[in-house]
């Protein structure tokens, strides 16, 4: 959500896509929404490390994003494209991501990919506890 939402909603309506595009606003049930998706598209202009991309992959979704997104977002299956790439090529990459997601069984691998990439709360808590212990013993 943001100040551009009404304009984007207008564009969607003008193009006859209102029955295919949902604007859901702020949600507390994002994990359930990820389970209803087949892949995640993130064509962002300005991003550092978008946690939404990490979360989507944790849910086992293949990710297609712009090259403006940092490489660190990739914990498994991410494709990066320049924003200047044609809509046809973006659509092709989305199609490829959907196929890869099915072929690799990403849903079942999401939790392991998360842990391997270091986005695991238990691992991070242990690491922080060890650092504090080392400081206390210093």
Residue ranges and their predicted role:
Residues 62-66:
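Short hydrophobic beta-strand element within catalytic cores of glycosyltransferases
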Residues 40-41:
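A short hydrophobic beta-strand element within the catalytic core of glycosyltransferases
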Residues 1-9:
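Glycosyltransferase donor-sugar binding loop
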Residues 48-55:
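Short glycine/serine-rich donor-binding loops of glycosyltransferases
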Residues 102-138:
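A charged, aromatic-enriched C-terminal amphipathic alpha-helix characteristic of glycosyltransferases
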Residues 26, 45:
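Aromatic "clamp/platform" in nucleotide-sugar-dependent glycosyltransferases that forms part
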Residues 9-25:
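Nucleotide-activated donor-binding/catalytic signature segment of Leloir-type glycosyltransferases, i.e.
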